[in-house]
């Protein structure tokens, strides 16, 4: 008897197939773990793909030292509870130079602490394939990127030189020094992610749920005061508002949204009504025209 899969089951099956394909074709894969909701779903899929064995690859977190404290606590707790092999990499040169989003601006900070940090880790451990949680509905440059995204020996992405992907057939051939970035969630939407998290009861960082938090209004965004390093500008005052985050990154560059959605059903209901992209809350996407595509060409995920 033929079984009809639901929409989420089809997405799950596709993602698991992609994850298994990478393990079968590459010598040294790694999964990027940014601690966000997409990473949570991707890790859950990887655990399903190889159960009862653990995923046969490590997780890599590029720590900029400016992540929300709740994110780091959640990362360490998940690593301890799940027992996965976690690599944490920090660009020490950037730390020694005192690079920060406040003094150097979002573009330079992102390039040094995120892009260069990622490239350092990929080179150090000689990973030839790296999973990422990017989705095509997030942003226009990601919308046109392949699921198996080729990178040169310098980790650069050329959007004009992408490989055809017919049905579920993927070209995994690379030369020495080259690599592939793989996006198992490419065809998922933000709503799909939230529905799957609810269905599978996947743990996520508490910042995704609405709560009263200290924020300042800066450049049209609500920036959470996460630690003492956030200095108030003239005229700014700390306000306590019920907010949550649709996307998580470095706290000085991530805007919150006013919300009362403190449960998964409420978040899903909110998603059904929203008409804006979650990436609007990320300052690094707006620091110059075509910002994300330029970052990806330079090696950003």
UniProtKB/Swiss-Prot annotation:
GO terms for molecular function: ATP binding; sulfate adenylyltransferase (ATP) activity. One of its GO terms (biological process) is hydrogen sulfide biosynthetic process. InterPro entries: PAPS_reduct_dom, Rossmann-like_a/b/a_fold, SO4_adenylTrfase_ssu, Sulfate_adenylyltrnsfr_sub2. It catalyses: sulfate + ATP + H(+) = adenosine 5'-phosphosulfate + diphosphate. It is an enzyme of class 2 (transferase). Its EC number is 2.7.7.4. Coiled coil: none annotated. Keywords: ATP-binding, Nucleotide-binding, Nucleotidyltransferase, Transferase. It holds the Pfam family PAPS_reduct. Pathway: Sulfur metabolism; hydrogen sulfide biosynthesis; sulfite from sulfate: step 1/3. Gene3D superfamilies: HUPs. It comes from the Bacteria. Heterodimer composed of CysD, the smaller subunit, and CysN. NCBIfam families: CysD (TIGR02039), PRK05253.1 (NF003587), PRK12563.1 (NF009214). Belongs to the PAPS reductase family. CysD subfamily. With CysN forms the ATP sulfurylase (ATPS) that catalyzes the adenylation of sulfate producing adenosine 5'-phosphosulfate (APS) and diphosphate, the first enzymatic step in sulfur assimilation pathway. APS synthesis involves the formation of a high-energy phosphoric-sulfuric acid anhydride bond driven by GTP hydrolysis by CysN coupled to ATP hydrolysis by CysD. This is Sulfate adenylyltransferase subunit 2. It comes from Geobacter metallireducens (strain ATCC 53774 / DSM 7210 / GS-15).
């Amino acid at each position: 008897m033929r079984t009809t899969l639901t929409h989420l089951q089809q997405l799950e099956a596709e993602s698991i197939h992609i994850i298994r394909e990478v393990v079968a074709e590459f010598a040294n894969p790694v999964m990027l773990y940014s601690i966000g909701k997409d990473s949570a779903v991707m890790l859950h899929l990887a655990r399903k793909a190889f159960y009862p064995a653990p995923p046969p690859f490590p997780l890599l977190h590029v720590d900029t030292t400016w992540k929300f404290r709740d994110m780091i606590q959640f990362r360490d707790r998940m690593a301890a509870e799940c027992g996965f092999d976690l690599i944490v990499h920090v660009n020490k040169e950037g730390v020694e130079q005192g690079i920060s989003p406040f003094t150097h601006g979002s573009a330079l900070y992102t390039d040094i602490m995120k892009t260069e940090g990622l490239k350092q880790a990929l080179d150090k451990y000689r990973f030839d394939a790296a999973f990422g949680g990017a989705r095509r509905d997030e942003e226009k440059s990601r919308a046109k990127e392949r699921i198996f995204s080729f990178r040169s020996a310098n980790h650069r992405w050329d959007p004009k030189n992408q490989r055809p992907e017919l049905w579920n057939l993927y070209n995994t051939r690379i030369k020495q020094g080259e690599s592939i970035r793989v996006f198992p969630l490419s065809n998922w939407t933000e709503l799909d992610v939230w529905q799957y998290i609810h269905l599978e009861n996947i743990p996520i960082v508490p910042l995704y749920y609405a709560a009263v938090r200290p924020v300042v209004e800066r450049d049209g965004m609500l920036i959470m005061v996460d630690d003492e390093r956030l200095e108030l500008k003239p005229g700014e005052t700390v306000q306590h508002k019920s907010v949550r985050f649709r996307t998580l990154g470095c706290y000085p560059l991530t805007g919150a949204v006013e919300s009362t959605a403190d449960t998964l059903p409420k978040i899903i209901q909110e998603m059904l009504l929203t008409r804006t992209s979650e990436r609007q809350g990320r300052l690094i996407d707006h620091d110059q025209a075509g910002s994300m595509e330029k970052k990806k060409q330079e090696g950003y995920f």
